[in-house]
Amino acid sequence: MREVISIHVGQAGIQIGNACWELFCLEHGIQPDGQMPSDKTIGGGDDAFNTFFSETGAGKHVPRCVFLDLEPTVVDEVRTGTYRHLFHPEQLISGKEDAANNFARGHYTIGKEIVDLSLDRIRKLADNCTGLQGFLMFNAVGGGTGSGLGCLLLERLSVDYGKKSKLNFCSWPSPQVSTAVVEPYNSVLSTHSLLEHTDVAVMLDNEAIYDICRRNLDIERPTYTNLNRLIAQVISSLTASLRFDGALNVDVTEFQTNLVPYPRIHFMLSSYAPIISAEKAYHEQLSVAEITNSAFEPASMMAKCDPRHGKYMACCLMYRGDVVPKDVNAAVATIKTKRTIQFVDWCPTGFKCGINYQPPTVVPGGDLAKVMRAVCMISNSTAIAEVFSRMDHKFDLMYAKRAFVHWYVGEGMEEGEFSEAREDLAALEKDYEEVGIETAEGEGEEEGYGDEY
């Protein structure tokens, strides 16, 4: 089997995790207590969903995941929630005091008390796998636990499981909506670590998803549940080919191979289509061409970033439901002829497609309409650099006055780490600038491009 272990860190990671596992259970017909009436091979078997669930001898299905937080309230909600019997109690790990929005607390002082226990649990899950493929990490980079403990875990996983791929879904601070004053510090410090220790990072941004909820689903005041269910659909589409059988299956490592041209250029934009409410869906014919076009719309992006300001390096289209390869090829051909969607000149093909026959599932009483087919796009675009430059600007304004820095230094961090992380991000912006430049004929050979990477 090609198993995947999910790690949910901090409040954002756990709440996105709740939405994801709720959806996975619905998709596979697994009840909240872990029983699965449709499963014929009790206690194992080589079913495709076993990549995400392990089975006990009694036929109970247990998610291969860990929930970690430095304070108990959010994990307690899982312990008492609808799905409390689904998870093994040892998979829910919580500390006593939180990271207080402080990267240094999550990474150095409080995080390191819990990290060994967490790695122990992850090791147990990994021993249960016959062919562990990699890890999915869910966290927010603006908080303390998600950024600090999340990065600490990624660093330790790189040591223990060097060859396994690590995909990261990170909730990134929005341009206008902020949940903490020190977000810029936490984000810059954690991105510094993400650059090194994760293979693919998918950027999610609450503000962008709020706008999608308002615009496409007519929800006037979206809650985190609305946002997380949308994010869950994206993650479900990405992992559908691991959990179901399809025509063109896509592996976790394949994302990496197809999307990451240089090791540092691994921050992705994601979009999903059709995001449409039940009332509207009734009157629309959502053909493959239509949903493909809407996945490329700037308004569909799950991060506040306009892909028209940059060029695409590669993109992965994951279709699910009633889709045949012929339609996909036609849709992609149309996209290539569009002038608004620009690709870098050194990447002529640029598309990786996956097709899965399992139609998208919707949560009963949720906002999304039940549709026949959907597409999820993960793209690597040079436009994501604007997300970093926005964050760096905010960081600079605060750091010029050394505001709030004493909280970090007091937790055992050195001031040098701030400037080191900031320089790393400046270099990243530069890298993105360089990959977007047109290559002049014949200069690529003799110039040593090997230095930067």
Curated annotation (Swiss-Prot):
Any one GO cellular component localisation term in the record: microtubule
Disulfide bonds: none
Database matches in SUPFAM superfamilies: Tubulin C-terminal domain-like, Tubulin nucleotide-binding domain-like
Organism: Toxoplasma gondii
Alphabetical list of Pfam families matching this protein: Tubulin, Tubulin_C
Upper lineage: Eukaryota, Sar, Alveolata, Apicomplexa, Conoidasida
Full protein name: Tubulin alpha chain
Keywords: Acetylation, Cytoplasm, Cytoskeleton, GTP-binding, Hydrolase, Magnesium, Metal-binding, Microtubule, Nucleotide-binding
Residues of the signal peptide: none
